[in-house]
């Protein structure tokens, strides 16, 4: 039996991409899974696909009341909450400082930080009492942009660096009751969109990047799928497999940190 059997897991942005892969994986692990999802169509799809195995709540991660409504439903359904996974986010499609008008930069900053940083903070606030009671955990999705430049423009990169600070501070404030960690995936097959303020709300990340372009820059030389990143979340959520980690950010970058100066990887001819 899985360590996560009957564990109560709350994931934001579970309707597509990494969020959907996490929903699938935790259901496979036997967990009771809930998600807060902005899109009504995706909520309906989740309910149709997973039935009683999913509690799908329509709501916005920038709204504390929506979080609280979801947590109330989770506690009614499961009687507890064991793990909160803050995952919903938006990307800036590499919008640069020089080429982005000042007014757009300002409005884009507020929209992107509201989702990528405030959304995590509000989720932590809503979930903290239940997680303190269960001595559970929080896990936040980062990005390779939390470590390196060029994984987005200054707005996205700054938001992911802000999230690392949030993880460390929450890990400090909530210890010893709650473990707080992060996972930073690299580029993957996803429907990640951009801010409306930048005119990117209908533009998917895969319209800016190609599988070949992503694979070429990774030393492991493959195009990751969302399911490839779910393992670290499962490990961090497990009390048996993770008693000791808090304030830790797992850099799941397919080897970006070991790219060579002359070649992406030295073993390409092996």
Swiss-Prot record:
The active site is at residue 156. It catalyses: 3-(cis-5,6-dihydroxycyclohexa-1,3-dien-1-yl)propanoate + NAD(+) = 3-(2,3-dihydroxyphenyl)propanoate + NADH + H(+); (2E)-3-(cis-5,6-dihydroxycyclohexa-1,3-dien-1-yl)prop-2-enoate + NAD(+) = (2E)-3-(2,3-dihydroxyphenyl)prop-2-enoate + NADH + H(+). Its EC number is 1.3.1.87. Gene3D superfamilies: NAD(P)-binding Rossmann-like Domain. One of its GO terms (biological process) is 3-phenylpropionate catabolic process. It comes from the Bacteria. GO terms for molecular function: 2,3-dihydroxy-2,3-dihydro-phenylpropionate dehydrogenase activity. Substrate binds at residue 143. Pathway: Aromatic compound metabolism; 3-phenylpropanoate degradation. It is an enzyme of class 1 (oxidoreductase). CDD domains: BphB-like_SDR_c. Converts 3-phenylpropionate-dihydrodiol (PP-dihydrodiol) and cinnamic acid-dihydrodiol (CI-dihydrodiol) into 3-(2,3-dihydroxylphenyl)propanoic acid (DHPP) and 2,3-dihydroxicinnamic acid (DHCI), respectively. Belongs to the short-chain dehydrogenases/reductases (SDR) family. This is 3-phenylpropionate-dihydrodiol/cinnamic acid-dihydrodiol dehydrogenase. It comes from Escherichia coli O139:H28 (strain E24377A / ETEC). The gene is hcaB.
């Amino acid at each position: 039996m899985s360590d996560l059997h009957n564990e109560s897991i709350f994931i934001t942005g579970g309707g597509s991409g990494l969020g959907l892969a996490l929903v699938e994986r935790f259901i496979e692990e036997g967990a009771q899974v809930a998600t807060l999802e902005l899109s009504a169509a995706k909520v309906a799809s989740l309910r149709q696909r997973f039935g009683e195995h999913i509690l799908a709540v329509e709501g916005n991660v920038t709204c504390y009341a929506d979080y609280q409504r979801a947590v109330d439903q989770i506690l009614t359904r499961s009687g507890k909450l064991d793990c909160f996974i803050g995952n919903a986010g938006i990307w800036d499609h590499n919008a640069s400082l020089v080429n982005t008008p000042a007014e757009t930069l300002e409005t884009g900053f507020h929209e992107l930080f509201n989702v990528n940083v405030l959304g995590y903070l509000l989720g932590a606030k809503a979930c903290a009492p239940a997680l303190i009671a269960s001595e559970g955990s929080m896990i936040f999705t980062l990005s390779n942009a939390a470590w390196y430049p060029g994984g987005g423009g200054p707005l996205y990169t700054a938001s992911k660096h802000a999230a690392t600070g949030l993880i460390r501070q929450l890990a400090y404030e909530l210890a010893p009751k709650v473990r707080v960690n992060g996972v930073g995936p690299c580029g993957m097959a996803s429907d990640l969109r951009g801010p409306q303020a930048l005119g990117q709300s209908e533009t998917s990340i895969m319209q800016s990047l190609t599988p070949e372009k992503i694979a070429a820059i990774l030393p492991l030389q493959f195009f990751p799928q969302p399911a490839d990143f779910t393992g670290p979340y499962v490990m961090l959520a497990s009390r048996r497999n993770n008693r000791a980690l808090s304030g830790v950010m797992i850099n799941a970058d397919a080897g970006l940190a070991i790219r060579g100066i002359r070649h992406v990887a030295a073993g390409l001819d092996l």
